[in-house]
Amino acid sequence: MLDTVAVAAEDPHHDQPWADLGLKADEYARIREILGRRPTSSELAMYSVMWSEHCSYKSSKVHLKQFSELAEVLAQRQPDAGRLLAGIGENAGVVDIGQGYAVTFKVESHNHPSYVEPYQGAATGVGGIVRDILAMGARPVAVMDPLRFGPLDADDTHRVLPGIVAGVGGYGNCLGLPNIGGEAVFDATYLGNPLVNALCVGVLRHEDLHLAKASGVGNQVILYGARTGGDGIGGVSVLASETFDADGPAKRPSVQVGDPFMEKLLIECTLEIFAAGLVAGIQDLGGAGLSCATSELASAGDGGMHVELDRVPLRDSTLAPEEILMSESQERMMAVVEPDDVAAFLAICAKWDVEAVVVGEVTDTGRLQIDWHGERVVDVPPRSVAHDGPTYHRPFARPAWQDDLQADAAESLPRPGSGDELRKTLLTLVASPNLCDKSWITDQYDRYVRGNTVLAQPSDSGMVRVDEETDLGVALATDCNGRFALLDPYAGAQLALAEAYRNVATGGATPLAISDCLNFGSPEDPAVMWQFAEACRGLKDGCLELGIPVTGGNVSLYNQTGETAILPTPVVAVLGVIEDVTRRTPSAWSTGGERVFLLGETREELSGSEWAHVVHGHLGGLPPQLDLEAERTLAELLHDAVGLVSSAHDLSDGGLAQALVEGALRHGVGVSVEVPDDAFVGLFSESPGRVVVTVPDGAAERLVELAERHGVELTALGVTGGDALVVEGQFEIPLDELRDAWTTTLPAALG
């Protein structure tokens, strides 16, 4: 028997599986209070997915509101800047980059589905973020993929990593979108909890911006794209709202299945619809599917919405109404269209062989009403589903073990003394999973499709040309060191921000805005919530000091197996603009005879470093000290040095040694340097705010003058050339030996 609104009113005591759907007793009681009756099974399905952790941000939104406040403060401080065209609350942030162009970008997570089904979980993660960008009115132009895995030698890493990489590459390659950057980091805490964060960037003209709202009584609601099936019912909303025990997830809904060729048609179809001016409002169908799209569109509009659910095209005719509402089948969009434009809209869809059906209309009732074969199965206030879910002020407290962790500094660990020991240490580090060559991964991605990629892996940032006539472009970088964030989550978030900011600046771009993906353990653990709260506070304070807004992002909680949470991993993506991509600064030198300099100050900062991790298996102490004002000054210097320096490469994981290795191996041109003072500290410290640059021999004096003018410390290191990495007075490593150590780790482990 169909559970209609009338039946629900007549049978108030009907037993309902609210707990199995992830709702708590007080949440279920609140739903009954809102409706004045028990919910129908369809309404219960909608509330359960929309009030899930993944969709409602119920544990995190009390901390996230400071990012909205940050945008207001920056707007008051810089009233003429006007860079942010759309921010938090939309599908993705939109930033003005000049010349009438805007860029929209966002990073999201698809962590839990990628553990259950690595290929499809990762592939649909890419597909979902691409549709978010498309829904803003933009053409997607590139993707990136910050990834985290368990130990490289673990069986489960061998299960998930190849599938995740193939999923990211397969979907992006089929869409014709270049993958221009990302990360692949290995740590024991990610075993059983891999992180698949996906970023997409899109380009639009200012006048093409579209928002998710259902306005205009009588306007038609059109569902178009792929048919709705049983895949992904409760997918991310269920999976991302629980921890995994040793046996895997207790609730195991099917992971969404992606079809990139359908998505490619959907992109081109949607862009033509935008160009024809046929859309009053639009929303992609991602997490929570139709439940999300209908409730968010209706609550963001000025009235209500009526939907005839039996009109939805199905792949599986046996699906019940609640299953249709919960399905997370991919490659679907929902548009609000004026009645006179419906025929033209449907004609464009037919041209692209995209199925489209009018499923409802905008009303003035203030209610979201959904019928199934003429019987009402949903009648709710849309805001109560989409926006007025529970808000938890979860307890948080600095863990008792934090003091002991910070007291256990790596600076006291045994360190190499002789040149031979330094040589051996360097070779060990460059062959370690986090520092080794990642070509095994990145070679599965097309980095240059579309022909506008300017920089891609292994450069510090990805860069794409936006306008082929003016050469206007944008740069993007994603970063996070989870070990630093464990030692001090406030500082760790700021260090992630600073590194991504610096990586954008090394290419010659000016940082403008950020998106974030905050990956943490269970919010029910006060220690994890303290990490989360501190990371949010650090990110807000850092952005305030750098003068750049948070445009939006994503929170992924419950990344934890039993009592073991992942390292706190606040991934930060920074977007920058460059006026002329032909003048970008590459990350590595390509000729001999160039002078090598270090910008920034090196301090003895080894806690949380790759050296401590790889050589000693140690994690403790305080992370490196950060000076955000110095980071901003360094970025300004790098901008002024465009055309003067021939390469610029930031120092981060692995310190100066790693930067020299990557610079020398990129084009097979060696380097000879003299490291002042303590060679070990000079090579392996991970002090932030540093960049290695090269300049033609005759330009060194100009660089010295520029550094003095900006007040940035400058150290002469040596000269490029030869076929070895030479540290004067310490050791020499032929490039062939260095390359063997750097490039063989992943192929040997993964085949």
Swiss-Prot record:
Mg(2+) 2 binds at D132, D284. GO terms for molecular function: ATP binding; magnesium ion binding; phosphoribosylformylglycinamidine synthase activity. This is Phosphoribosylformylglycinamidine synthase subunit PurL. The keyword Membrane does not apply. The active site is at H54, H110 (proton acceptor). Keywords: ATP-binding, Cytoplasm, Ligase, Magnesium, Metal-binding, Nucleotide-binding, Purine biosynthesis. It comes from the Bacteria. The lineage of its organism: Bacteria, Bacillati, Actinomycetota, Actinomycetes, Propionibacteriales. Its EC number is 6.3.5.3. Signal peptide: none annotated. It comes from Nocardioides sp. (strain ATCC BAA-499 / JS614).
